[in-house]
């Protein structure tokens, strides 16, 4: 399966989504900012983008289910949200969870709750 979930469409998330999409991967992006979702669709950097509060466990589980083997959590600036999303994705059964972190402490916490890889862009 080459389906990727990108959570967050800030600069880092847009760059990740665009790279995956250009390389023929199926990309679903989740973002709470409507303007960023519209831009992603308009610039054709994803297959689909959905406006969603990703910290809403019920909504996230409904959309993600078990359709993705890799998720990239690109919301490093909001530590609480990145931790919560990572934990939910792990509970859903996403095998590979790559998370953006802004510091070593955040990275350690993300690994404890389920991140398989932490990046510090």
Where are these regions (language model features)?
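Cytosolic regulatory regions of ion transport systems
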Residues: 1-121
């Amino acid at each position: 399966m080459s389906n990727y979930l990108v959570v967050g469409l800030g600069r880092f998330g847009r760059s990740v989504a665009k790279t995956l999409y250009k390389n023929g991967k199926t990309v679903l992006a989740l973002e709470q900012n409507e303007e960023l979702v519209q831009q992603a669709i308009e610039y054709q950097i994803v297959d689909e983008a959905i406006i969603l509060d990703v910290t809403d466990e019920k909504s996230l589980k409904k959309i993600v289910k078990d359709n993705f083997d890799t998720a990239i959590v690109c919301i490093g600036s909001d530590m609480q949200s990145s931790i919560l999303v990572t934990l939910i994705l792990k509970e859903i059964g996403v095998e590979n969870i790559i998370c953006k972190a802004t510091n070593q402490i955040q990275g350690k916490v993300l690994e404890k709750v389920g991140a398989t890889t932490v990046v510090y862009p």
